[in-house]
Amino acid sequence: MKSYEVNFDGLVGPTHNYGGLSYGNVASQSNSQQASNPREAARQGLAKMKALADMGFKQGVLAPQERPDVAALRRLGFSGSDADVIQRAAREAMPLLVASCSASSMWVANAATVSPSADTADGRVHFTAANLNCKYHRSIEHPTTSRVLGAMFNNEKHFAHHAALPAVAQFGDEGAANHTRFCRAYGEAGVEFFVYGRSAFDSRYPAPQKYPARQTLEASQAVARLHGLSDDGVVYAQQNPAVIDQGVFHNDVISVGNGEVLFYHEEAFLETDAVLGQLRAKLASKGGNFQAICVPRAAVAVEDAVRSYLFNSQLLSRDDGSMLLVVPEECRNNERVWAYLGQLTSQGGPVKEVKVFDLKQSMQNGGGPACLRLRVALKEAELAAVNQGVIMTAPLYDTLLQWVDRHYRDRLGEADLADPQLLVECRTALDELTQILKLGSVYPFQRQP
């Protein structure tokens, strides 16, 4: 049976704005309070989805969340009508309103961790929604994330869904942004690679000093248990705390893996040789030939990697066995990074081509190509069991473009978030979107009695 890696990209929501909410994310902080263009952001994301689908890659869409999150504001003591809640929050606690309007769910690499059926004890694809408890604006996402994933992968024979881990710092979980998988073929058993920033209960592990380590070892271990993964199919690695302090807030900012290949920066991990040795040995036991591509600091400094998002790229397998690296425009604009990529594609390794996309609206908030997608390896029967309304096609692309143009503003500043009409616009748009994507009632406003 054939198997595929399907990339489900997050559709940018109508409240896309630059709130500067993500401490430790250099781009998010440095572009705080700029005016955003939600319509352009959504169109940029859709253009990437359509281009990759046109190239033959399997591509899906993951819906955005209801924002502003009025229910979250009510839990914080704001009362009255929805308009009252928004306007009072704007007067008394603008940072809370900004957080409740965040469109950060577009970065669906943080939506969940996914284990393919070939790796799990019960032979189903497993999903665990990420609690994202390090940042308030993201910690409110997982209930809707779980409902959306449940509506997309809604066949119990093939798919198992787990609730987010306990929402405490000891189990901080950032989803697939700190997880990748190596395999000879997508439908065969592979090795799942969990990267953490600190240990919650063992003080012998080092930790960053400036920025928070968002993923704990204990969270990664819990997800592996929930998914029924075997010890011979899992490797845990600690991210280098020094690079977290340089703005590498998730592992997908310093490495990317696919198939049998890990593309990583020299400074990405602690005890790199031991980590690579485990990956090589465990993948070999499953018939695979692990290949590591190390980018030396002499070629690309960590600062350049963070600024360009070289590693927040998509490493995609072509039918001929070669790989394509999808990078943001910022890589072409960085002289050192672009020179390195020229060498990479000409030296006879697996990466044969680099494709550049303009994702500036997302990049200015600290999210590149890899942030925008959740990878799900599926066998043919599993892909057929996915809600087909979310699979990217030419007609769906056209429908979504028209939907965006109808409902999205082309400029959004902080003051606009206090406009109750924005909530009406968002709910109208999302109500229509659930019909387009055949999701049913996944949003809180659709579920109210």
Swiss-Prot record:
Sites where the protein binds substrate: 19-28, 110, 137-138, 214, 252, 365
Family (UniProt): Belongs to the succinylarginine dihydrolase family.
Record protein name field: N-succinylarginine dihydrolase
EC number: 3.5.3.23
Record SUPFAM superfamilies: Pentein
Database matches in PANTHER family: N-SUCCINYLARGININE DIHYDROLASE (PTHR30420:SF2)
Active-site residue list: E174, H250, C371 (nucleophile)
Stretches the record annotates as Disordered: 23-43
Subunit structure: Homodimer.
